[in-house]
From Swiss-Prot:
InterPro entries per UniProt: WTF
Gene it is expressed from: wtf23
Domain of life: Eukaryota
Task of the protein: Promotes unequal transmission of alleles from the parental zygote to progeny spores by acting as poison/antidote system where the poison and antidote proteins are produced from the same locus; the poison component is trans-acting and targets all spores within an ascus whereas the antidote component is spore-specific, leading to poisoning of all progeny that do not inherit the allele.
Compositional bias (Polar residues): 57-72, 89-98
Protein family per UniProt: Belongs to the WTF family.
Protein name: Meiotic driver wtf23
Cellular component, GO, one term: endoplasmic reticulum membrane
Length: 368
């Protein structure tokens, strides 16, 4: 018995049969298929692996389950349409147009920003709607018409100018980023250069403070400039503080903790100078034209400059001087201590010798 149709067991078989019944213009009409003896191959057998899932799984039984008791999956038009909608729903975004209200609002904001400078200028000149004549009102009407045309153009070409604004903002942001990076590199190079020439920079600072303090001293003493004494005292103290801070070349002068340590040393030095000067003046009973504060400021200023010059000429001289003074004091104190220990040992030794004399010898010495 020859059949001109295929038995339909599922929707997939129905779809396969529908495709097989179509005539291929290149291969001609479909040949007849004898399902009993199998003498004639199915139509377009080279495409059978793409048509019949069970034929595809004939060589590989694990690929499809050919058990007739199991219902094959439903590949109907509804499931295909659902799959098609799912694939397209996650692929592209919604390209719905922007609402007219949003277009109008952004266009109005643009016109408002454009008119803000003009309104501010007229308000600053006190000419906003004041003493307007015929010509001024004509200009105002023309300007309103221009703004209206610009508003309509912005509303109509909303997508175009929004894209242009976005591109411009991105370009400006990149320019700002490049400029900031360039300035940061310049600052880094300048700071490295200043650090490498820090000795020369400190000499320049010292010269500037020296000139300023000398000018202030001269003006105050000559009477040409009436300054408060606190100004000259603070100037001298600040100069000494600055010079002592930057005196150690090997230590970065921008280190906060070491700067505080230098300030503490300056205050201790200042207190020592005050005590020495006041004690000397009290012991000698002499009176100078300058007060104790003026002498203190002058000595502190001179001492700071001398120490600074010594450090500039011989880096590390202050540290070596401090160590030398400390070692000298330790040596002197050690010598004094050794001498005292020697005397103590001598007295102790004499007492021990007297206590160790035999009694017979003491009697003989007594008889003699």
């Amino acid at each position: 018995m020859k059949n001109k149709y295929y038995p339909l067991r599922s929707s997939m078989d129905e779809l396969s049969a529908k495709n097989d019944n179509e005539i291929d213009l290149e291969k001609g009409p479909l040949p007849e298929y004898n399902s009993e003896d199998g003498s004639t191959l199915p139509p377009y057998s080279e495409n059978i692996n793409l048509k019949d899932p069970k034929q595809m799984g004939a060589n590989n039984p694990n690929l499809f389950n050919t058990d007739e008791s199991t219902t094959p999956p439903d590949y109907g038009e509804d499931s295909l349409s659902i799959t098609h909608r799912e694939n397209h729903s996650s692929g592209t975004a919604d390209n719905s147009s922007t609402s007219p209200l949003k277009k109008a609002f952004l266009s109005f904001i643009s016109i408002f920003v454009l008119n803000v400078p003009a309104v501010c200028y007229l308000t600053y000149k006190d000419a906003l709607f004041k003493d307007y004549g015929k010509d001024e009102w004509v200009y105002f009407g023309v300007w309103c018409a221009i703004c209206l045309m610009i508003f309509i153009s912005l509303w109509y070409f909303y997508e175009t100018w929004i894209k242009a604004v976005k591109v411009t903002v991105i370009f400006l942001a990149q320019c700002i980023k490049v400029t900031v990076v360039f300035l940061a590199q310049c600052v880094k190079v300048i700071s490295i250069g200043l650090f490498n020439i820090r000795r020369e920079m400190m000499i320049i600072i010292w010269l500037l403070w020296l000139i300023i303090c000398c000018i202030l001293f001269g003006c105050v003493k000559s009477g040409d400039l009436n300054l408060n004494k606190a100004l000259i005292y603070s100037t001298c103290t600040i100069s000494a503080v600055l010079l002592l801070i930057v005196s150690s070349v090997c230590i970065p002068f921008w280190t906060f903790e070491r700067t505080l340590a230098k300030l503490a040393k300056v205050f201790l030095l200042q207190s020592g100078i005050v005590l020495v000067l006041n004690g000397t003046m009290f012991l000698r009973g002499k009176h100078f034209e300058w007060t104790g504060c003026e002498i203190e400021a002058s000595v502190l200023f001179i001492m700071g400059n001398v120490l600074f010059l010594c450090e500039m000429e011989c880096p590390g001289a202050l540290i070596r001087t401090r160590n030398s003074i400390r070692n000298g004091i330790a040596f002197i104190l050690g010598g004094i201590g050794n001498a005292m220990m020697g005397l103590a040992n001598a007295f102790r030794g004499g007492n021990d010798n007297n206590n160790n004399i035999p009694l017979g010898e003491m009697d003989v010495e007594g008889e003699v």
